């Protein structure tokens, strides 16, 4: 069982001393005495960072992308995790422009490329201290980092019917014991309740092991319940693409209509059918209707609940289906349609082409580095909440729940 984050997102044994450092929400990293507090500009979103030269070669990159962040994991949390390395320069958690909520990923800058590489090799897929059921998810934050970036293929499976106590680590070890090519595992968590949704994903680097696992592990117990295994969208080793659960951090278009449960799917391969689309998206909840307009390279998936549509948007944006990378956004809200016929609703929202939907390309973590100026965050992000905007919600009071990241 995993604990909910303490109030304010501060780890239980990381409470800061009553001093001037508190104005930055500083935490003593891992109980190391004498660690210097972070500079003010690191924690003030409005502060302008000093300009610096953007790296031009792989050996100059000193920034890591970090994903799978919980809504309460802020810059203070990242500092508490990595400042003990002695070479952390700054951190930035990406937030939604409208709500100010954490989008699930961020960036950490180190003093040198070598320092960043040591952290990447040491912490990637390692348990987070004080939260051992959650794993660090790290990668290089630049497309130019060449073969040092993990662009190997990902072959992913869906794992359903998980018990409430199954965490990322438990799921990972369940499969790693039999399949050496397992690269990672993710149990999907409901952001509202903090509880597992009862399903997750496991990534392999070997396609033959993925295929074997789909047969051999179906019905095998994980914790107290037998698992239900199925196919999931996979990354085929193309630079800049992201795996099925890592894409949860992608910045898809926000929809504020509580009644809209429809997802637009762009860039479909011609071989993908309505049934194929339904099988992939049904992993995220009950589906009301699926439609791929004749002759079009896009489709629509309507869920019974908005939360299911949100999860599908987070998980599937930018993955491969049928040989192409799909792009997801919100479809037209049912409250805006003029006809009660579902088929008319879908066709009516299609317009003159995929661009009419205004869907966004999946925001690969590396794409942000084009605007990231090495020593600060003055370019490209545009994620800082506007003045007068409500701050992110505080995490709930500490309690015991079935949790994993």
Curated annotation (Swiss-Prot):
Protein name as catalogued: Polyadenylate-binding protein RBP45B
Family according to the record: Belongs to the polyadenylate-binding RBP45 family.
PANTHER family listed in its UniProt record: POLYADENYLATE-BINDING PROTEIN RBP45B, TRNA SELENOCYSTEINE 1-ASSOCIATED PROTEIN 1-RELATED-RELATED
Leader peptide range in chain numbering: none
Stimuli inducing this protein: By both biotic and abiotic stresses (e.g. ozone, oxidative chemicals and pathogens such as virulent and avirulent Pseudomonas syringae).
Region ranges (Disordered): 1-54, 379-405
Domain RRM: 62-143, 155-234, 261-333
InterPro entries in the record: Nucleotide-bd_a/b_plait_sf, RBD_domain_sf, RBM42_RBP45_47-like, RRM_dom
UniProt GO MF annotations: mRNA binding; poly(A) binding; RNA binding
Compartment annotation: Nucleus
Keyword annotations of the record: mRNA processing, Nucleus, Repeat, RNA-binding, Stress response
Bias (Low complexity): 20-35, 380-405
Organism whose genome encodes this protein: Arabidopsis thaliana (Mouse-ear cress)
Function: Heterogeneous nuclear ribonucleoprotein (hnRNP)-protein binding the poly(A) tail of mRNA and probably involved in some steps of pre-mRNA maturation.
GO biological process per UniProt: mRNA processing; response to ozone
Subunit structure: Both isoform 1 and isoform 2 interact with poly(A)+ RNA in nucleus.
Residue spans of biased composition, Pro residues class: 1-19
Tissue localization of expression: Expressed in roots, leaves, stems, flowers, siliques, and seedlings. Present in immature anther tissues (tapetum cells) and mature pollen grains.
Cited Pfam families: RRM_1
GO cellular component assignments: extracellular region; nucleus
Main localization of the protein described in the UniProt heading: nucleus
């Amino acid at each position: 069982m995993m604990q909910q984050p303490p109030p304010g997102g501060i780890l239980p044994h990381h409470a800061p001393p009553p001093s001037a450092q508190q104005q930055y929400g500083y935490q003593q990293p891992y109980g190391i005495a004498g660690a210097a507090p972070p500079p003010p500009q690191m924690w003030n979103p409005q502060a302008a960072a000093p300009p610096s030269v953007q790296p031009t070669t792989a050996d100059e990159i000193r920034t890591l992308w970090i994903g799978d962040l919980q809504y309460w994991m802020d810059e203070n949390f990242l500092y508490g995790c990595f400042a003990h390395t002695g070479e952390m320069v700054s951190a930035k958690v990406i937030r939604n422009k409208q709500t100010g909520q954490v989008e699930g990923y961020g960036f950490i800058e180190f003093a040198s490329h070598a320092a960043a590489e040591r952290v990447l090799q040491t912490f990637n897929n390692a348990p987070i201290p004080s939260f051992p059921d959650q794993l660090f998810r790290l990668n290089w934050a630049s497309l130019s980092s060449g073969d040092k970036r993990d662009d190997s293929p990902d072959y992913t499976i869906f794992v359903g019917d998980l018990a409430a106590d199954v965490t990322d680590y438990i799921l990972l070890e369940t499969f790693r014991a039999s399949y050496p090519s397992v690269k990672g595992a993710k149990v999907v968590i409901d952001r509202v309740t903090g509880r597992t949704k009862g399903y997750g994903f496991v990534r392999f680097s070997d396609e033959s092991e993925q295929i074997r696992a789909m047969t051999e592990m179906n019905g095998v117990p994980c914790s107290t319940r037998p698992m239900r295994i199925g196919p999931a969208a996979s990354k085929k080793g193309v630079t800049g693409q992201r795996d099925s659960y890592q894409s949860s951090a992608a910045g898809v278009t926000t929809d504020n209509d509580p009644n809209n449960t429809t997802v637009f799917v762009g860039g479909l391969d011609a071989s993908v059918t309505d049934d194929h689309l339904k099988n992939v998206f049904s992993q995220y909840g009950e589906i009301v209707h699926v439609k791929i307009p004749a002759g079009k390279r896009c489709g629509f998936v309507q869920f019974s609940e908005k939360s299911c549509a949100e999860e599908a948007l987070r998980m599937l944006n930018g993955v491969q289906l049928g040989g192409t990378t799909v792009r997801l956004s919100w479809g037209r809200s049912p409250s805006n349609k003029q006809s009660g016929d579902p088929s008319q609703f879908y066709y009516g929202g299609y317009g003159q082409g995929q661009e009419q939907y205004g869907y966004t390309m999946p925001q690969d973590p590396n794409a942000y580095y084009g605007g990231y100026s090495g020593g600060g965050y003055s370019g490209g992000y545009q994620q800082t909440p506007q003045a007068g905007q409500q701050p992110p919600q505080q995490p709930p009071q500490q309690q015991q729940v079935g949790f994993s990241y």
